């Protein structure tokens, strides 16, 4: 875990939500350029792709009353965020762009897909950079402990 503690962590990338939108390739490249580690969020699309987005819907960042789980990764890629040229990347695209240049902390939003853990394991087992997964869902964290102990994992806590 030392790789994750050596530098500040850019939560959802390094962004201002004006010119650079959170959880986009632009925000992650900005974090890398400024020597930050990256925290990002993953949800599943209709076609079972792991896409990088914090919310379960598009209301806040695209002003659309649509659910992520109801759209394919291509449909999501075609939606521009906050009047910029940025769209919702897949986790594969982010891993390719980051390419081990900085540590990644992946928050799993497990509420929208029952097999998100399996899909993330498939994707992450071939990634060579420093990476860990985390979740508020203890069952998700237990799943990684039992089924993918080679991936670092952690539980996120909150006030009751």
Please provide the spans of the model-predicted regions.
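Phosphate-group recognition and catalysis centered on beta-loop-alpha active-site segments
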Residues: 1-160
